[in-house]
Amino acid sequence: MKQTTIARRVETVGIGLHKGEPIRLVLEPLDANMGIVFHRTDIGASFKAEPANVVNTQMATVIGNEKGFISTVEHLLSAINGYGIDNIRILVDANEIPVMDGSAISFCMLLDEAGIKQLDEGKKVILVRKEVEVAEGSKFVRTVPSRNPKFDYTIKFNHPVIGEQRYVFEFSKSRYVKEIARARTFGFLKDLQRLQAQNLALGASLDNAVAIDDTHILNPEGLRFENEFVRHKILDAVGDLSLLGAPLLGDYIAFAGSHDLNHKLTLAVLADEKNYEIATLSGELLKDYQKVFA
């Protein structure tokens, strides 16, 4: 199997979650072995999507360096990882990725418009060789070896609308689009009011998030899935794990995970070469994992 990029340049415009202003997003093809590269056109700064460039994980995944940063990259990265795209250049004219509808489906549609192009180099993957776990109290994220990669996620909120939810997602492109990509981000009204008082989340609305008060969902259309909340957590994890630089072939298991724990997991996996193996997807290995990329 070969590495991929997009076939043609595409662009869109969307609102930024925090500033509430229009942002121009452009996706461009990139050569083999270049990975995922972000570029801020407004300040002329580039950042490679990798764990070392993560600078904040409090409310979103933020990458950057001394020249600047780009916030809320996880939904776009999730779509890119879900589509198995290895190399792509992402250009934005602001310090955040547009929120679109709060899910990854708009980015999937943009990738469909761009098309997928195979390159000459073999596709690299990260095979999980040992269990790796990062925990904080009862919360944890872990990855374990598996020939049938899946995301097994449980969330637990002391809230009547959410409660405890678990979803197991067997990874493949087709299932990603059907089961995960449309799940929207969610937030509590009391938190939104606090953030907007700090001039943050100014672009948040019922058009780009599931909003919850003390007892109800505020969106008139309701949920897209009965368990949309936990599905969105999987969406985030698919995006955060893309920072490893290649598809992770192993199970991801989480209880009450977060962007911060996901980031710490990527660092922990890469910290010891006994934890993983970088391999080219071919021969018997390709046969084992073919359906992941279907």
UniProtKB/Swiss-Prot annotation:
GO terms for molecular function: metal ion binding; UDP-3-O-acyl-N-acetylglucosamine deacetylase activity. Pfam families: LpxC (PF03331). One of its GO terms (biological process) is lipid A biosynthetic process. InterPro entries: Ribosomal_Su5_D2-typ_SF, UDP-acyl_GlcNac_deAcase, UDP-acyl_GlcNac_deAcase_C, UDP-acyl_N-AcGlcN_deAcase_N. Its cofactor is Zn(2+). HAMAP family: LpxC. This is UDP-3-O-acyl-N-acetylglucosamine deacetylase. Belongs to the LpxC family. The gene is lpxC. It comes from the Bacteria. It comes from Campylobacter curvus (strain 525.92).
